Structure formats: structure tokens, C-alpha cells
Amino acid sequence: LLLRVLLELGFHAEPLSARPRWRRPPHEHVARTHMAVRVRIDDRDWLADVGFGSCMLTAPLDLAVAGPQQTTHEPARVVPLEGELRIERLLTGEWLPMYDLLLAPQKAVDLQAANWLISTHPASSFHQNLVVSRTRDEVRHVLVNTRLTTRRAGAEVEYRELDAAGLEQSLVEDFGLPIQDNFRPLFELLSVKQ
């Protein structure tokens, strides 16, 4: 959606693919299942990415700058690799890899295959879990099944395990989502499984 909006507004933008590295062992081989957008403005390439959930970029990154770059939330940096760029976030004093970005533009069919894989493969975390993320002002909320993580700028990270009522309340208050009656059995099931 972001790519389409940027193109419609007249920006020179193209999709790039990336190998997610977030919370994975350093040498684990993973498919390129993430899409980010390269935007060219005044002969400079910028990375725009609003779809990486729990640590999504809250400002574009200048792909030519290898050092730390400030975003609305945590700093990020671009680390040159052989044929790729690694995007990292600074959390609790440590640089953590988000993903390795391939700089070759991607075709729609490749992106469709990646989307199909992460949405339907039985081993995909998105197929097995309830995952919701919202970033606003100076707070991030991430819900994975019944675990709510809240990160506020300059504050300790807060973790909470939610019961069925807490899930419903969090989805409404923290994520701004409407709840339908047929969701409640899922909330009960999730709270029992945890």
C-alpha cells in the first residue's frame, strides 16, 4: 500500500526485499519475505518501511549514511554488507539486526510469493499467532497472542500477560481496533493456551 501511495503521489519508488533477522540466530538462513520501499529524492535513496511491526521505522533512513540515524523512536543504522544492507535498531544499548536488504528492485510476482509464504505456511509465525503492532507518538504497543509489550521513549519496557478480557481491552484501547462478538471465543482460546 505504501508503495502504491508513493507512486501515485509522483515519487520515484521501488520495492526491495529483505531477509528478516529480528530475534533470530546470526547465521540462520531465512527467505526474503519482507518488503521495504526505496524512494529517490533529489538524487538520494531513502528507505521507507512501515510494515516491520514491533520495531518498524518511524522515519525514513538515508541509505547512503552508514552511521546512526535518529527516528521518532529508537535510533537506526544502515550497515553495508556484501551486496546487501543490514538495517539495525538500537534497543537497550545494543544494536540489533532487523533485516538484510537486497538492493535490486523486486517484481510483483516475487513479492506475491513471499506474502503467500508468510501468510499460509504452517511454520510461519503469522500463521500460528495473533500479532498486532501499533506505533504512535512516543509509544509502541506489540501484542503477540496474550503478551502485550509496551515501549515508551526513555522508560523501561513493560510486559503484561493478558486474559481474555485484557485482550479485548488492549485491542480497543491500545490498538484502536473494533471488536466483534465472534472474536471473543478466540480470546478465550488464546488465554487458555498460554
Provide a role label for each language-model segment.
Residues L7-L9, L81-Q194:
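N-terminal accessory/pre-domain segments preceding catalytic cores
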Residues R4-R77:
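Hydrophobic/aromatic-rich core segments of domains that either
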